Amino acid sequence: MRSRRLLSAAHLLCLCAVALAAPGSRFLVTAPGIIRPGANVTIGVDLLENSPPQVLVKAQVFKIASNKSRSILEAEGVFHRGHFKTLVLPALPLSSADKIYELHINGQSENEIVFSNRTRLTFESKSISVLIQTDKAFYKPKQEVKFRVLTLCSDLKPYRTSVDIFIKDPKSNVIQQWFSQKGDLGVVSKTFQLSSNPIFGDWSIQVQVNDQQYYQSFQVLEYVLPKFEVTVQTPLYCSLKSKQLNGSVIAKYTYGKPVKGSLSLTFLPLSFWGKKKNITKSFEINGFANFSFDNYEMKKVMNLKPLTDVSEGSYENVDPSFPGPAEIIATVTESLTGISRMASTNVFFKQHDYIIEIFDYTTVLKPSLNFTATVKVSRSDGNQLTPEEIENDLVTVVTQRKNNHPESQRDQEMDYIQTVNYTIPQNGIIKIEFPVMSISGELQLKAYFLDGTSSVTVHSMFTSPSKTYIQLKTRDEYIKVGSPFDLMVSGNRQFKDLSYMVISKGQLVAAGKQSSRTFSLTPEASWAPKACIIAYYIAEDGEIINDILKIPVQLVFENKVKLFWSKPTVKPSDKVSLRISATQSDSLVGIVAVDKSVTLMENSNSITMETMVHELELYNTEYYLGMFMNSFAVFQECGLWVLTDATLIRDSIDEVYDTEEYSERFAEENEANLVDFEDASSVNNVHVRKNFPETWIWLDAYMGSKIYEEFEVTVPDSITSWVASAFVISEDLGFGLTTVPAELQAFQPFFLFLNLPYSVIRGEEFALEVSIVNYLKDTIKVVILIEESDSFDILMTSNDTNGTIYRKTVQVPRDNGVTLVFPIKPTHLGEIPITVTAASPTASDAVTQTIVVKPEGIEKSYSKSVLLDLTDSNVESKQQSMRFSFPPDTVIGSERVQITAIGDILGSSINGLSSLIRMPYGCGEQNMIYFAPNIYILDYLTKQKQLTVNLKEKALSYMRQGYQRELLYQREDGSFSAFGDIDSSGSTWLSAFVLRCFLEADYYIDIDQDVLHRTYTWLNAHKKFNGEFWEPGRVIHSELQGGTKSPVTLTAYIVTSVLGYKKYQPNIDVQDSIKFLEFEFSRGISDNYTLAIISYALSTVGSPKAEEALNLLMQRSEKEGDTQFWLSSGPALSGSWQPRSVDIEIAAYALLAHTLHHVSEGIPVMRWLIQQRNSLGGFVSTQDTVVALKALSEFSALVHKENTDIQLTVTGPGIPRSIHFRIDSQNLFLLHQEELHALDPITVNVSAHGSGFAICQLNVDYNVKGSGSSKRRRSTENQEVFDLDVIVNNEDDISHLNLNVCTSHLGSERTGMVLMEVNLLSGFSASSDSIPLSETLKKVEYDNGKLNLYLDSVNESQFCVNIPTVRDYKVSNIRDGSVSVMDYYEPRRQAVRSYNTQVKLSSCYLSPDTNCKSHTDGATDSLRRSSSLLVFCSVLLYFVQH
């Protein structure tokens, strides 16, 4: 309840002497007790019969500040005796602030001041409505959030203003923001892209308007849309005397058809005491099933015991004496797919069979007027009353007593008791009305029906010195805007005229006089959703006699919008028209259509009628105490201030509160356009279904001069129902809403779906399961046809007698489904599409899905780049050669060779922004490879004036997604660590890295400044007095851990990061850290990595030691041809064409230092770096890729040359015709590429003519065989740095396989972060949730047949992990899987082992009809389409099987 400062009567009336001397009552003035920006202040003026004939009324609103008042609103008008009219003051501006406001009002006739007073108005900040609509309430990673912001005035007219919008993740970090957004008619539409790995939980859209905050939440989580809905129907109440509890379960697909399957039903008591017990039953279900639990079953699990009369079914509870509710849980499992869905409901237990409810009864007694109430009789089991039960009467006993008599003094003479019987109608609702005795001070109503009983008691008495009362009521139960309703006024005295007023949302919205005791009013839109009606008259003695009636008013929008589909039912991929009908032209219609499966997930962020009613109720300021016991309280109950010279009665307690045309036409068209699913379909022109969105339509439609619009759209391929809704908004009529969503059923009564693995390895065979569903009227004969392809063969099984290998015929019963199996053997590598068609004389369907076929063995890659520099005017041509030989264990057919050329140093990295390296990046540092390179690319292209709109949007999208993901790893203290809050501490190295990247990105995307500040503050707290930074957490980058110089390296790294924070905190001082670095440099730095970072750090601050450090670094470099680089010492590593990751970082830091000193001397370093790039545009690992791209982008901007025009010619033994690439200023960033024949060895000759420079790169991908030695604990081929052992456990289990993987480091020191990659066997899957995390194992990711396990570090102690896997698909002749362990920041430090299942499937197991006698590997024959071969193989199979 709001506190109101309404002035008491003593303070209220300040009337002049003339007014006080005047005989009789002359005026009654009312005004709202509040003032609201945007809303008029409406004053009611009723000049009574003793008033002067004409009064000039003037009202002003003053704003008071610093003891000074200023008039800001005013109005005046002439009022006449005997009339009740209103005076309307203009509204406060919507931007008004919460200040002190006073209303001054005075009335003047020719000769006198009739009245004059003032009152303080309470400021109500709720002045506008801001609605935030999203297309859904739930989102998956990588999905797009579509949302609208609507700003409306309190009358639902558009409010044109600018809004600020913020997207916040569950940690309240600002992920994206838009400032000063304005939209047409107050509607702003935006979209927001979620990253592939966002923080799960409740996200929010925050909108700021006029310093007010508005929110809408949405959830981000992993989910699968339900394809069918389960509902449980039970009565809300059940009598303990009932013989049983009955209910039903309904299971329907979103397209309306029944679900066939099994039903598990559980009765679970929800009491808080005793041992939990339940009842579980199982049934078959075909869309509907009835169930019952008898009283004996329920008694057992609810701890009930029979009373003496067991036959009556009465029970008492053991402890306590009355049972709590029970939950009924229904789980339906679809027979065709095995998918389950659950629903539940609660049942409350009553001690009686019948429930009596008394409501809408009089709460304040008015003697001699009627007491009214509504009584409802119902069965506790929810069933209708039977004709036999209705023959019994409802018995009411009314007891009326005198007031102020304690119980001990009461006797029956003081009580008036009356018993009345009522006949019960079919609906069980009875209206009761009887007079209140003149002596009554208390009234009790008791109602009885069979064993049910209920009662209410009313103690409150209306206060009137003259005992004069009126009663205001209506018989209309449903009152809505625009429809008249009747009001009846009864009283115990005669009266002539009656005044009335209507108040809603704190404002006086209607007023007038009536001479009849029955009159009608027509609600306007301003009345909704609740209105408070006051009726009154002035008695002869001057007393105000009044009453109040509160009514709900159903909201009816003046601006109407309707959506219609041109057809109610369509087939997937059909064309259909969405038709829009609006009331007014120049309207904006916002439409959303979503899969009905989305609506089954309970929550919704749609704008509905309930949304609007709730929104409008927020404007209401009435007290709603329900205890208006005198004439003053009646006005107060509706939030009114009253000024009158009539008698206004109040109690002492009151002092406390002083502070359709289109629908018919479309319906006809819909009837004519019903889809006839029995029509014959053309098998030769079957649409293949591929498009399955969750949100189909999100459209802002501008109607222009029309009130009718039609859009043709293509129905997606989902077999479901689509639910479309819309709102409309226009300048004059404001907001409107579709009252009923337009539902479109996208359904075909005959369809198929495929079940196949995501990928297999060449040489493996798999079972393609084809399920056909038939909802036609009859059983049909269906031909299943696999589209022939050179990419796979179909294996013949012994029982294939009803068709050929590509074609089968099957009978599919009506309202049922059948599954067929086709054994498939892929023959080509890559993505293989499989198209299946199901055809019958009456219907057909086709579906295409792809399967990825990978080569066997372990993936390897090689890249070689050459820089063709023709920038010297004296050089017109250059030639370069590149060579590669495949190792002897290369898998035949896995080889892929490609030549690329591009005209810009960063060109290949720009083209590969989405995936720069071949490693997963699932921790806080590695994620930044998805973020940081985009900054450097944008910087570089902006400087070169080569930034295109498409590339900018692409880079910004990657950055926003990377930013979202990175915030997963921010800890509560503001620091960042590899795995966020699960780590024991934040990392200064990683926090500095993230801070630097966020500061660099702040120019392009929205970065929450609070995130930056918290990170910087945490970093600064980890600096020692001498300027040295220290690392409290684990250092996952191996080059930064251990050794005497690691604090020096860390400090240099952090200095380069925190300097960027100067734009937010200009007084940052890093001189102590610089002096620390200079001192350590003067002592000597033997490590090249540390020296490189120090050189860069000292260069960024202009240290006098910077050039000396850089010179020393260059002296230690290696030179080869026109390149310059560094080689770090270290243990022997697994073979790789790329250098160590640390060597790339050293070169990158040296190049960054050269951007500040002696630019030309850095060109040889740049050339070397370019040559180390992989085919994706990145380098070895994440950190080296980020630093190298930063260095190349900044350095290239300094040495970039204009006017490139180069002709490249590529020749070689495997190139029958020369390949020509033309690179000029118009296509510098175009990646030219050609596939080459994979000859061994590969020799590629490149010649360049012209001017400028180009980069040519040879990329080779291939697989090597997993040799037998790789299965042993350790390879003798390479000096591995990890010991790795893989043990397979599944001796007798065909469906499960457990891997036990153990590893340790073959060295005394602890490693940095280690990545374990487990390539699963084809057909098997593993859940990342089934592998528990530990201090060593920090994260597990599942990625399309592969598990990535992130280990914090590995030492000499063995670390083991158990990986349970499950067979999801039947795959025979399974090839080896592999397990690898590698140092993430030095991937050449690795070990690889292969493994396989001990229980292998032969091809005969792929068909369910085949009797397989052996579970060892069997040979399979791939049968071609040749008829002779088919006969031969059939004979061969016959002899083999016999």
Swiss-Prot record:
<comment type="similarity">
    <text>Belongs to the protease inhibitor I39 (alpha-2-macroglobulin) family.</text>
</comment>
<comment type="function">
    <text>Modulates negatively TGFB1 signaling in keratinocytes.</text>
</comment>
<protein>
    <recommendedName>
        <fullName>CD109 antigen</fullName>
    </recommendedName>
</protein>
<dbReference type="GO" id="GO:0072675">
    <property type="term" value="P:osteoclast fusion"/>
</dbReference>
<dbReference type="Pfam" id="PF00207">
    <property type="entry name" value="A2M"/>
</dbReference>
<feature type="glycosylation site" description="N-linked (GlcNAc...) asparagine">
    <location>
        <position position="117"/>
    </location>
</feature>
<dbReference type="GO" id="GO:0001942">
    <property type="term" value="P:hair follicle development"/>
</dbReference>
<keyword id="KW-0449">Lipoprotein</keyword>
<keyword id="KW-1015">Disulfide bond</keyword>
<dbReference type="GO" id="GO:0005829">
    <property type="term" value="C:cytosol"/>
</dbReference>
<dbReference type="Pfam" id="PF07677">
    <property type="entry name" value="A2M_recep"/>
</dbReference>
<dbReference type="GO" id="GO:0010839">
    <property type="term" value="P:negative regulation of keratinocyte proliferation"/>
</dbReference>
<dbReference type="Pfam" id="PF07703">
    <property type="entry name" value="A2M_BRD"/>
</dbReference>
<dbReference type="InterPro" id="IPR009048">
    <property type="entry name" value="A-macroglobulin_rcpt-bd"/>
</dbReference>
<feature type="glycosylation site" description="N-linked (GlcNAc...) asparagine">
    <location>
        <position position="67"/>
    </location>
</feature>
<feature type="lipid moiety-binding region" description="GPI-anchor amidated alanine">
    <location>
        <position position="1419"/>
    </location>
</feature>
<dbReference type="InterPro" id="IPR001599">
    <property type="entry name" value="Macroglobln_a2"/>
</dbReference>
<feature type="glycosylation site" description="N-linked (GlcNAc...) asparagine">
    <location>
        <position position="246"/>
    </location>
</feature>
<keyword id="KW-0646">Protease inhibitor</keyword>
<dbReference type="Pfam" id="PF01835">
    <property type="entry name" value="MG2"/>
</dbReference>
<feature type="glycosylation site" description="N-linked (GlcNAc...) asparagine">
    <location>
        <position position="278"/>
    </location>
</feature>
<dbReference type="GO" id="GO:0005886">
    <property type="term" value="C:plasma membrane"/>
</dbReference>
<dbReference type="InterPro" id="IPR041813">
    <property type="entry name" value="A2M_TED"/>
</dbReference>
<dbReference type="GO" id="GO:0030512">
    <property type="term" value="P:negative regulation of transforming growth factor beta receptor signaling pathway"/>
</dbReference>
<dbReference type="GO" id="GO:0005615">
    <property type="term" value="C:extracellular space"/>
</dbReference>
<dbReference type="InterPro" id="IPR002890">
    <property type="entry name" value="MG2"/>
</dbReference>
<feature type="cross-link" description="Isoglutamyl cysteine thioester (Cys-Gln)">
    <location>
        <begin position="923"/>
        <end position="926"/>
    </location>
</feature>
<dbReference type="InterPro" id="IPR036595">
    <property type="entry name" value="A-macroglobulin_rcpt-bd_sf"/>
</dbReference>
<dbReference type="InterPro" id="IPR050473">
    <property type="entry name" value="A2M/Complement_sys"/>
</dbReference>
<dbReference type="Pfam" id="PF07678">
    <property type="entry name" value="TED_complement"/>
</dbReference>
<dbReference type="GO" id="GO:2000647">
    <property type="term" value="P:negative regulation of stem cell proliferation"/>
</dbReference>
<dbReference type="GO" id="GO:0098552">
    <property type="term" value="C:side of membrane"/>
</dbReference>
<dbReference type="InterPro" id="IPR011626">
    <property type="entry name" value="Alpha-macroglobulin_TED"/>
</dbReference>
<keyword id="KW-0472">Membrane</keyword>
<dbReference type="InterPro" id="IPR041555">
    <property type="entry name" value="MG3"/>
</dbReference>
<keyword id="KW-0082">Bait region</keyword>
<feature type="glycosylation site" description="N-linked (GlcNAc...) asparagine">
    <location>
        <position position="1088"/>
    </location>
</feature>
<keyword id="KW-0882">Thioester bond</keyword>
<feature type="glycosylation site" description="N-linked (GlcNAc...) asparagine">
    <location>
        <position position="421"/>
    </location>
</feature>
<dbReference type="InterPro" id="IPR008930">
    <property type="entry name" value="Terpenoid_cyclase/PrenylTrfase"/>
</dbReference>
<dbReference type="Pfam" id="PF17791">
    <property type="entry name" value="MG3"/>
</dbReference>
<dbReference type="InterPro" id="IPR047565">
    <property type="entry name" value="Alpha-macroglob_thiol-ester_cl"/>
</dbReference>
